[in-house]
């Protein structure tokens, strides 16, 4: 398993919120500073976030930047 695969499979928190001003959804990983994307639908935002996470992690590995560990807290809203 590659170093990238190890990081991609870690349980990073994904937050997806509706964009009330522009429409669509914004998705981001709070542990991965600057790893943010959007999509016209919830599913598109999630898929874009998965791709963005892999690109973000790849850039960090290539540049020798320290990658934070996932937050172990459970996040939920009612």
Write out the residue ranges for each language-model feature.
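Short, charged, surface-exposed hinge/linker loops at domain edges
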Residues: 1-13, 47-78
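Short aromatic-glycine-(Arg/Gly/Cys) micro-motifs in beta-strand/loop hairpins
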Residues: 16-32
């Amino acid at each position: 398993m590659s170093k990238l695969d190890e990081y991609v499979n870690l349980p990073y928190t994904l937050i997806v919120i509706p964009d009330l001003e522009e429409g669509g959804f914004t998705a981001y990983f709070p542990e991965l500073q600057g790893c943010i994307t959007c999509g016209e639908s919830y599913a598109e935002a999630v898929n874009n976030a998965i791709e963005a996470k892999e690109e973000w992690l790849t850039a960090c590995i290539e540049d020798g930047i320290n990658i934070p560990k996932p937050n172990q807290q459970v996040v939920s809203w009612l």
